[in-house]
Structures are given as structure tokens and as C-alpha cells.
Swiss-Prot record:
Bias type Low complexity, positions: 150-198
Subcellular location as annotated: Membrane
TM stretches of this protein: 225-245
Stretch list, region Disordered: 53-75, 150-211
Top-level taxonomy: Eukaryota, Amoebozoa, Evosea, Eumycetozoa, Dictyostelia
Membrane association type: Single-pass membrane protein
GO CC annotations on file: membrane
Protein name: Uncharacterized transmembrane protein DDB_G0285607
């Protein structure tokens, strides 16, 4: 057995049968089966194309190669593009190619086969050996091919429940690759028609990857569009907020709301109160319940020499009412309420209720 394409085999080459080692089928198909001598060769694709012409084939009928490959093939005895196919089956060195497509393999005594499945996308290979591969690096033997296993055509997709799926009606020696259970000719080089058992896995895998890649690209485009739209929306919202802040000075308004009225800066015109008021000296701490009508009775005769403070037409002595004098500045007024800043305190003087109130900043 000379496999000239051994370089393309990345996993192993093995013989599944020894000559003259057969087991009589426990369940016979409708048509008699002659003993066959297939050799199963597992090819794990490594992004290459495999050519059936390079594989030794002792079958005199070379036109049947396309019917015996679990893969996407064309009429030039050449596998199609397998860049996205991870594995495929090649069946060669056999007698009676029409027997290979028969779904009953109870007549074959399989010694053992070790198969490493690189992808868990497919738990079973949809070829005639369907059910053989179920997990990674698992040893399978002839016990997997018992009479209890349903070896009917698993790839019948014609939705005809009354159709016999044993592929007994397929003309597998036809060069036109009648790969459908309905005996329709497949003249498409890419085998777009529904394939039979032996090419179904490769076709299904190939179709799956094209479908998967197609939708993967669509999903990628959709995700990029979605991300772009969301980014644009966020930038637009930020721009609107920035314009509102710039136009309406929302920061200042928010500060005023948070700190009530005490952060509003408005210059008090000195002409309203006179120079004495703006240059007056106030104590660090005002008496909380100081009434502005409270007057100093010593008629300005104070030993400290401090000038009487005149506010709102009333006058009172600074020393008798205040212990320490420090300069404070008028920082603003709102609705006749005046604020005097001294250290960390705001002093509110309301001429309507005539009370001086201590406010902590």
C-alpha cells in the first residue's frame, strides 16, 4: 500500500481490515453484499488541498473516486478547497465501490482505530462510520458496530418519511456523481446537492464553515456598527451637556442650589451704606441673637477709642458688644440679606427682620 500523499496525513495511517478477516453481518440489507477490502485513511487537514490522483488506488474504476471520498470534491478527482476543513475520510484500495456506500458495515471487522478530534463542533462524523468518533483520543473497536446500531442513511434530508434510506437505489458507479437519495444527477463541481453518506460529513462541514464564517462576518459588522452608533450617541450627549453648561452656566446654578444662596457673589455698592459701613470692623463671632436695634448707652464714650458702628440708621458701640475686631468684607446680598465673610463664617444681616444670624460656611 503506497500512499504517496503521506505528507498530507497529519495524524496517522492505518488499516482497518486485515485480508480475509470478515464477520458475517447480523443484519443483512435487501441486496446481498460481497466481501470488500477497504482501507480507511484518516486525513487531518492542515490547510492544504489533497489530490486523489496522488493516492494509490488499486481499483480499476478510477471514476468512482468521487463517490468514495468523505469530502467536497469535483469531477476532476480533486478535493475542493479544504482550508476550513479539519478532517476528512479517504477510502481507497477496495473492491466493489458500490458496497462502500451501503449503510450496513456489520460485515466489517474493525480492529481498532484511534482518532483525535481537534474540534468539538461535531460530535459525530456524518459518514458511513457515523457514531465511530464521539470524543477526543478515544479508542473504538468493532463493538461499536453492532446490529443494534442504526446504519441507515443518516443524511437523508428530503423530508420523505416513506423513503427507503438504504441507498440501495444509488448508482454509485455513475461518473456524474448521483449523490442524492432521489438519484438526481449532481453536475455541480462543488457538490451543492445533498450528498450521500460518504461525502456528507465533508460537505456538511464545508457548508457549516461557509455558513458560520458568513454569519460571523455579518455579526462582526453588526457589532462594529452598533459600537460606532453607541459611541456617536455618547459623544452627542456629552456635547449637548457641554453646550448647556456653557450657555446657561449650569455649574454656577448647581452650586447655588447646593449651597443655597451663600455662594452667590454680588458686589455691594458702597454708596448704599456709606464708607463707614464698608470700612467697619466686626468681631470674629457675632452674638447669635443680636438685635440690630440694640444700642450702646454710653453715647460713644468708649475707652477703646473704637468708632461707633452705624448700620441702618442705628448706632452701637463696638467694644461694648464685640470683644475682638477683625476686618470682614461684604460679599453679596440677596433680597436685602447681606453677607459678611470673616474666616469661615458667613454673617447674614437681614434688615427686614433686623436680626444678625451666624451662618457656618
Amino acid at each position: 500500500m503506497d500512499f504517496t500523499s503521506s505528507k498530507s496525513v497529519s495524524l496517522f495511517e492505518t488499516s482497518l481490515l486485515k485480508e480475509n478477516q470478515f464477520q458475517q453481518p447480523q443484519q443483512q440489507p435487501s441486496s446481498p453484499i460481497k466481501p470488500i477490502k477497504p482501507i480507511l485513511k484518516l486525513v487531518v487537514n492542515s490547510n492544504k488541498k489533497y489530490n486523489n490522483k496522488n493516492i494509490s488506488n488499486n481499483n480499476n474504476n478510477n471514476n468512482n473516486n468521487n463517490n468514495n471520498v468523505c469530502g467536497n470534491i469535483n469531477n476532476n478527482n480533486e478535493l475542493g478547497d479544504q482550508s476550513d476543513i479539519e478532517r476528512s475520510f479517504l477510502i481507497n484500495n477496495f473492491e466493489g465501490s458500490d458496497q462502500l456506500t451501503n449503510p450496513y458495515y456489520n460485515s466489517i471487522d474493525i480492529e481498532s482505530i484511534i482518532i483525535e478530534v481537534y474540534s468539538n463542533q461535531f460530535s459525530k462524523l456524518n459518514c458511513d462510520f457515523q457514531g465511530l468518533i464521539s470524543s477526543k483520543s478515544k479508542i473504538l473497536n468493532s463493538n461499536n458496530f453492532s446490529s443494534d446500531y442504526n446504519y441507515n442513511n443518516y443524511n437523508n434530508n428530503n423530508n420523505n418519511n416513506n423513503n427507503n434510506n438504504n441507498n440501495n437505489n444509488n448508482n454509485n458507479n455513475n461518473n456524474n456523481n448521483n449523490n442524492n437519495n432521489n438519484n438526481n444527477k449532481n453536475n455541480n463541481k462543488n457538490n451543492n446537492n445533498k450528498p450521500n453518506n460518504f461525502i456528507h460529513h465533508h460537505h456538511h462541514h464545508h457548508h457549516y464553515h461557509h455558513y458560520h464564517n458568513h454569519h460571523k462576518v455579518e455579526n462582526l459588522i453588526d457589532s462594529h456598527i452598533f459600537i460606532g452608533l453607541m459611541a456617536f450617541l455618547i459623544l452627542f450627549i456629552l456635547m449637548v451637556i457641554g453646550l448647556l453648561i456653557y450657555k446657561y452656566n449650569l455649574k454656577k446654578r448647581v452650586l447655588i442650589l447646593l449651597e443655597k444662596r451663600y455662594q452667590r457673589k454680588k458686589k455691594v455698592k458702597t454708596s448704599q451704606f456709606g464708607d463707614d459701613f464698608t470700612s467697619a470692623k466686626f468681631s470674629q463671632v457675632f452674638p447669635k441673637n443680636l438685635n440690630i436695634n440694640q444700642k450702646n448707652k454710653d453715647d460713644g464714650d468708649d475707652s477703646s477709642g473704637a468708632d461707633d458702628l452705624s448700620v441702618g440708621g442705628e448706632s452701637f458701640d463696638g467694644e461694648s458688644d464685640f470683644e475682638h475686631f477683625k476686618e470682614v468684607q461684604v460679599v453679596g446680598d440677596i433680597d436685602n440679606v447681606f453677607f459678611f465673610k470673616n474666616n469661615n463664617y458667613y454673617y447674614e444681616e437681614n434688615f427686614d427682620n433686623e436680626n444678625l444670624i451666624n451662618k457656618e460656611f
